[in-house]
């Protein structure tokens, strides 16, 4: 193939073409077609340009041609194939391109090469062929031309421009500049063919590009061949493109690596794996050594210093309360009444932010800062709509067969659009419509929004909410059907085309409007045409002042009610309004009342039956203790009410969840103490006591210390829970701690008094609940003080323990097996503990039947775009100073580590940083906007602002000044026109105008002379889709790392500025960044608290204390293993439950250890005795009571109840019982001392805690 290339900047003398070859194809302009001038056909040679203004434009836009034509001396006559008017038209066209591509000077200079050659080069006929026509005045004009270019030239120009970013949207500029193609589907030919297509709005006549690679063999046609520079290179007196727009200009930096990978063995955390293995091997060795060796077990002594102090104190106190029950009850009732009155001051919150984010947490501080300066994030009302018929289909076009997903089936789309029309009309009849509450960013200042101007993200916007346009269909000349699918193809591929803008004046993001496409790599755009569902988003204004939100709340309720009642055979809808989560929290609380009440009733019935010792149906009402059980439960609930009142006085906000769960928790704990006190009293040898109140005092003396130990441990653990920064958890812990304290105080006072009254009723032969009626049986009470002839009571459960369970458990083979099994299970639990996932599934916080649960599920399937991240830059910069501008901007001459460049660089690694696009930059767009002469306008009459598209004669271009290099506005210009930029709406001429994107992003003040000073501002950046807790907290961790690096850059440059990243979701996930550290601290502090409480209550008995501590640690480790096995995540709720586990674990251990300490005989005998007497009580009084109430929670409608209360509390009970009733007796039988340390008293030494059952 013979192709002749022409290089236009070779000096004219080097060309040997004839004069005819060097002629023009046009000169001057003939007339306008539409908004564009067309050129006169003219084949004469080039003519001199006699307009200094136009010559200056030509010199600026076409410097190479200018230098060539002016000669080396610069004095040659400038002869061109264009006149002054054509140069001005060329300038106008290039200015439009500047609005998109001006961020990269090399790109615009490269583009100008071919435009200048086409418009003015004096050798037109070498590479242009004109096709003329005659207008009505008989003047020849050029109708269209053939423009012959080499592929290499245009490819280089295209490559220099392909990386340019449109900073307002974070998209490539080529998305706006390649017609129906986006940056990924565009190429150099498609780009130039779009710029030559007369059917567009920007081309005055058709330009048919002829490509050198398509030239026929042997052709003598000449193709214009130029040498454009790469984007990283610069022309003389110009600049190379910046890093954001040109990868070649970016400095070499290390890619972010994310968090360090943990060392793992077999998928488990290596450190705990090896540690558990070592412990397992060591313990197994000692177990076998002890089992088969001849050495006897070590003798462990348990000395005490003041163990009797608590016994005597509680005995005296119990005796006093039993002797004066009326006074005690009166005083307690007054205290209860006084504290309960505080409930009237109690406040309950359902605000998710108030529930899950502490006021001093970093994300809460950042959220409050953002809300106060820029206003709170929009109120989002959103729908996900799936097609019931999930059938894919095709559509034939001139470009081939297109594949479409079920979301674009005609009847489905039509119904969705009709549904959207109905939603947009909600409330309009009552003047409470969407237009009253919606967010409308593209409005002139003072303009009142209409529904059409509301920001609604929906594919219906691609048809401008016009059903006729959607239904329009016809067959083109090639017999292809042109319908709504063609429009969808164009708009899904290039949403930045003006024909695809929504009625509100902005683009519809495909990633926000459609979903369910096949998965692609992170950072890649999916094939939107294969969507299986649609997303409709209605944005509402939000306010810090909640009183202004009433119209929003009304419309959102209309939205929810309408969609709840909407039925369709084609549409499967999930929806959520901004208010839905708060409504769901209220619904959750109200819905769980029945579950909680049933749980309480079950425990009450159990207590009422088990508390008495019923021997026959005839003596039921005498031997039952229903009234005592009711009194005990009332005391427990009174302690909860008093706790609510106590914190109400102190104005501590609480939640419905706390109000529902705390009574259950305190009831489970309090009922244990009821059993312990009653049955300890029943097991006494009453003949050794002169009066009933002395016997009761003795019972309280025996069990009081252990009750104090367990209550103190639980209260201390809840107090540790108050350290949590999460309000819902903190207030739960605070209320529970006081409730347990008050419950303890009321039980050792009021309940003791009730025991005395009930015992007097029993001894007098009166019936339970009918105390005025006496039974026909013998009266037991002995008024002469010679003792009370009441039989000792031994229950069935204790008998079973004594005759069967204890001998079996404490046999040598079983003890060895128990130790081995618990060693293996505990070590396995330790191995898997670090593998527990952090987080809280969003669905769990909602009722199962809530519409929000379905919304969360559909969000995982259909959401293709993440939430916006706002990089908030606090005051401290002088933006009018170029050196400080360079720290922020991303354009020419900006620092390579500037804020914008760093955010751009991080967005190149979305799989790590979760940043999907480069950030918008108001500063870059403002500088670009000022650089275009016709964008900034002012009114010469008023001196005020004029919009850039104003055609008024009173509106003239702003008087602007620039720095010496011409790149930046001077300080006066910069400060003067910031309000103009933020008031100006973008259009084709001034795409960088800032009102739509930045009206809320820049906070500024204006001084007396009209100069603006920027204070706070933000830079918005879209994130990748995040739906799990791990994705959200990983993103938060990364943006904090990035903001830290940017702040470090500010410090290096001695700038007192600070930046932070804000996203509306971060506030819920901050806890997971430190959850393991918080867990270790809280659990460690809880264990320390238990150690100190136990050491004190046991009279500084170090051995007993360590045994209790060791057992509680084992319970905790196995609880963590259960969490891993049962898929319970670690979060603030489960952490508090673990702290509760530590506290309640003491109950399963402390009573048995105390009983062992007081018993007589060898370690084996004492272990068997403590298991028979106290172990049976632990099973019936602690384990079964909690189990009865917990099982009911399994039927809860709340997943939080099911997972974090049913599963975890069930685990606490079962694991605690297993350790207390299986492992502990075995350990005590091996480690217990041979000597007797029991205290002698009037009571039977071995009498302890038991619950009798028949």
UniProtKB/Swiss-Prot annotation:
One of its GO terms (biological process) is intestinal cholesterol absorption. Disruption phenotype: Larval lethal at the second instar stage. In larvae dietary cholesterol absorption is impaired. In the larval midgut there is a severe reduction in cholesterol and failure to accumulate cholesterol-rich trafficking organelles. No effect on total cholesterol content, possibly due to maternal contributions. Glucose absorption in the midgut is not affected. Expressed in the midgut. One of its GO terms (molecular function) is lipid transporter activity. It is found in: Cell membrane. Disulfide bonds join 24-81, 62-116, 82-120, 104-241, 107-161, 178-186, 231-246, 243-250, 438-454, 491-500, 889-894, 935-990, 936-958, 946-955. Important for cholesterol absorption at the midgut epithelium. Acts only in the early steps of sterol absorption, prior to Npc1a-dependent intracellular sterol trafficking. Residues 592-757 form the SSD domain. Glycans are attached at residues 123, 132, 389, 479, 896, 939. It holds the Pfam family NPC1_N. This is NPC intracellular cholesterol transporter 1 homolog 1b. Residues 1-16 form the signal peptide. It catalyses: cholesterol(in) = cholesterol(out). Its main location: membrane. It is a multi-pass membrane protein. Belongs to the patched family. Residues 294-325, 615-625, 679-736, 837-857, 1101-1105, 1154-1174, 1229-1254 are cytoplasmic. InterPro entries: HMGCR/SNAP/NPC1-like_SSD, NPC1_MLD, NPC1_N, SSD. The chain crosses the membrane at residues 273-293, 326-346, 594-614, 626-646, 658-678, 737-757, 816-836, 858-878, 1080-1100, 1106-1126, 1133-1153, 1175-1195, 1208-1228. Keywords: Cell membrane, Cholesterol metabolism, Disulfide bond, Glycoprotein, Lipid metabolism, Lipid transport, Membrane, Signal, Steroid metabolism, Sterol metabolism, Transmembrane, Transmembrane helix, Transport. It comes from Drosophila melanogaster. Residues 17-272, 347-593, 647-657, 758-815, 879-1079, 1127-1132, 1196-1207 are extracellular.
């Amino acid at each position: 193939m013979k192709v002749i290339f022409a290089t236009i900047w070779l000096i004219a003398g080097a060309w040997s073409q004839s004069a005819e070859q060097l002629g023009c194809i046009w000169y001057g302009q003939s007339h306008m077609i539409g908004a564009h001038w067309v050129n006169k056909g003219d084949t004469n040679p080039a003519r001199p340009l006699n307009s200094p203004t136009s010559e200056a434009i030509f010199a600026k836009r076409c410097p190479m041609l200018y230098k060539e034509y002016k000669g080396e001396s610069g004095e040659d006559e400038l002869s061109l194939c264009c006149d002054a008017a054509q140069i001005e038209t060329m300038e106008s066209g290039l200015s439009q391109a500047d609005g998109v591509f001006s961020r990269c000077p090399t790109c615009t200079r490269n583009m100008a090469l071919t435009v200048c050659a086409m418009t003015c080069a004096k050798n037109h006929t070498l590479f242009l062929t004109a096709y003329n026509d005659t207008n009505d005045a008989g003047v020849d004009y050029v109708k269209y031309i053939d423009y012959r270019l080499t592929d290499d030239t245009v490819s280089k120009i295209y490559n220099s421009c392909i990386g340019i970013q449109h900073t307002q949207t974070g998209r490539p500029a080529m998305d706006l500049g390649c017609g129906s193609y986006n940056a990924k589907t565009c190429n150099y030919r498609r780009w130039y063919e779009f710029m030559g297509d007369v059917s567009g709005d920007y081309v005055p006549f058709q330009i048919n590009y002829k490509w050198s690679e398509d030239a026929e063999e042997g052709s003598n046609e000449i193709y214009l061949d130029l040498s454009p520079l790469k984007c990283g290179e610069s022309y003389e007196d110009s600049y190379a493109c910046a890093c954001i727009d040109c990868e070649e200009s970016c400095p070499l930096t290390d890619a972010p690596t994310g968090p360090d990978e943990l060392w793992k063995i077999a998928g488990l955390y290596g450190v705990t794996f090896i540690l558990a293995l070592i412990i397992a091997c060591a313990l197994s060795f000692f177990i076998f050594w002890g089992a088969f060796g001849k050495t006897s077990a070590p003798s462990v002594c348990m000395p005490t210093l003041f163990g009797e102090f608590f016994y005597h104190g509680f005995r005296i106190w119990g005796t006093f309360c039993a002797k004066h029950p009326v006074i005690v009850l009166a005083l307690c009732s007054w205290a209860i009444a006084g504290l309960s009155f505080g409930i009237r001051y109690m406040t309950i919150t359902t605000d998710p932010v108030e529930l899950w984010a502490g006021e001093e947490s970093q994300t809460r501080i950042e959220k409050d800062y953002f809300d106060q300066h820029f206003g709170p994030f929009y109120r989002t009302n959103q729908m996900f709509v799936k097609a019931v018929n999930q059938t894919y289909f095709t559509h034939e076009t001139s470009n081939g067969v297109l594949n479409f997903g079920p979301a674009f089936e005609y009847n489905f789309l039509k119904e969705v659009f009709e549904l959207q029309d109905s939603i947009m009309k909600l409330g309009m009849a009552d003047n409470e419509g969407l237009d009253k509450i919606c967010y409308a960013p593209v409005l002139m200042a003072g303009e009142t929004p209409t529904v059409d101007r509301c920001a609604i993200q929906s594919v219906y916007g691609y048809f401008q909410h016009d059903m006729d346009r959607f239904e329009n269909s016809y067959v083109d000349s090639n017999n292809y059907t042109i319908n709504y699918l063609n429009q969808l193809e164009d708009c899904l591929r290039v949403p930045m085309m003006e024909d695809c803008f929504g009625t509100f004046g902005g683009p519809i993001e495909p990633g926000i409007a459609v979903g369910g496409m096949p998965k692609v790599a992170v950072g890649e755009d999916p094939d939107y045409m294969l969507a299986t569902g649609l997303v409709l988003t209605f944005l509402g204004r939000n306010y810090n002042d909640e009183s202004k939100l009433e119209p929003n709340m009304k419309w959102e309720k209309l939205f929810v009610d309408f969609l709840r009642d909407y039925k369709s055979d084609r549409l499967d809808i999930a929806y959520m309004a901004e208010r839905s989560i708060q409504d769901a929290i209220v619904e959750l609380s109200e819905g769980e009342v029945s579950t909680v009440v049933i749980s309480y009733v079950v425990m009450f019935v159990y207590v009422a039956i088990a508390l008495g010792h019923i021997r026959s149906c005839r003596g039921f009402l005498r031997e039952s203790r229903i009234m005592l059980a009711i009194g005990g439960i009332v005391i427990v609930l009174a302690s909860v009410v008093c706790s609510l009142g106590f914190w109400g006085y102190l104005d501590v906000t609480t939640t419905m969840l706390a109000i529902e769960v705390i009574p259950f928790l305190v009831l489970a704990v309090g009922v244990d103490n009821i059993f312990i006190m009653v049955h300890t009293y029943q097991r006494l040898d009453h003949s050794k006591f002169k009066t009933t109140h002395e016997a009761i005092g003795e019972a309280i003396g025996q069990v009081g210390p252990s009750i104090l130990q367990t209550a103190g441990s639980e209260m201390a653990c809840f107090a540790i829970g108050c350290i949590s920064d999460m309000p819902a958890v903190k207030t739960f812990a605070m209320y529970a701690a006081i409730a347990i304290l008050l419950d303890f105080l009321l039980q050792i006072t009021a309940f003791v008094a009730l025991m005395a009254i009930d015992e007097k009723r029993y001894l007098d032969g009166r019936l339970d609940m009918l105390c005025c009626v006496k039974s026909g049986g013998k009266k037991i009470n002995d008024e002469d003080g010679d003792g009370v002839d009441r039989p000792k009571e031994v229950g069935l459960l204790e008998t079973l323990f004594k005759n069967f369970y204890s001998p079996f458990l404490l046999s040598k083979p079983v003890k060895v097996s128990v130790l081995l099994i618990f060693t293996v299970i505990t070590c396995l639990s330790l191995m898997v503990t670090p593998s527990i996932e952090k987080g809280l599934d969003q669905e769990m916080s909602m009722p199962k039947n809530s519409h929000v649960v379905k919304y969360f599920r559909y969000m995982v399937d259909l959401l293709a775009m993440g939430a916006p991240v706002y990089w908030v830059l606090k005051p401290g910069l002088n933006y009018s100073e170029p050196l400080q501008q360079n720290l922020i901007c991303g354009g020419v001459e900006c620092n390579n580590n500037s804020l914008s460049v760093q955010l751009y660089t991080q967005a190149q690694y979305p799989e790590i940083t979760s940043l999907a696009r480069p950030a918008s930059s108001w500063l870059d767009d403002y500088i670009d906007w000022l650089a275009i002469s016709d964008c900034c306008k002012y009114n010469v009459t008023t001196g005020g602002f004029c919009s850039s598209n104003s055609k008024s004669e009173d509106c003239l271009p702003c008087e602007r000044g620039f720095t010496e290099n011409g790149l930046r506005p001077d300080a006066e210009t910069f400060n003067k026109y910031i309000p103009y930029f933020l008031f100006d709406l973008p259009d084709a001429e001034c795409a960088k105008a800032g009102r739509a994107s930045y009206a809320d992003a820049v906070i500024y003040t204006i001084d007396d002379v009209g100069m603006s000073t920027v204070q706070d501002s933000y830079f918005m950046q879209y994130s990748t889709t995040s739906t799990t807790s791990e994705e959200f907290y990983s993103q938060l961790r990364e943006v904090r790392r990035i903001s830290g690096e940017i702040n470090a850059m500010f410090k290096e440059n001695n700038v007192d500025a600070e930046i932070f990243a804000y996203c509306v979701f971060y506030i819920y996930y901050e806890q997971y960044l430190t959850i393991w550290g918080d867990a270790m601290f809280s659990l460690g502090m809880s264990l320390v608290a238990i150690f100190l409480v136990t050491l004190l209550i046991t009279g500084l008995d170090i051995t007993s204390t360590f045994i209790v501590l060791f057992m509680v640690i084992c319970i905790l480790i196995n609880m963590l293993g259960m969490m891993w096995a049962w898929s319970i995540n670690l979060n603030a709720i489960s952490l508090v439950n673990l702290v509760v586990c530590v506290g309640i674990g003491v109950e399963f251990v402390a009573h048995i250890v105390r009983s062992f300490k007081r018993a007589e005989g060898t370690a084996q005998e004492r272990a068997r005795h403590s298991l028979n007497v106290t172990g049976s009580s632990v099973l019936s009084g602690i384990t079964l009571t909690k189990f009865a109430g917990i099982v009911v929670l399994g039927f809860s409608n709340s997943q939080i109840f099911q997972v974090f209360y049913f599963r975890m509390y069930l685990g606490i009970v079962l694991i605690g019982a297993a350790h207390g009733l299986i492992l502990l007796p075995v350990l005590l039988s091996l480690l217990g001392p041979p000597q007797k340390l029991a205290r002698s008293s009037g009571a039977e030494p071995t009498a302890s805690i038991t619950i009798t059952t028949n």
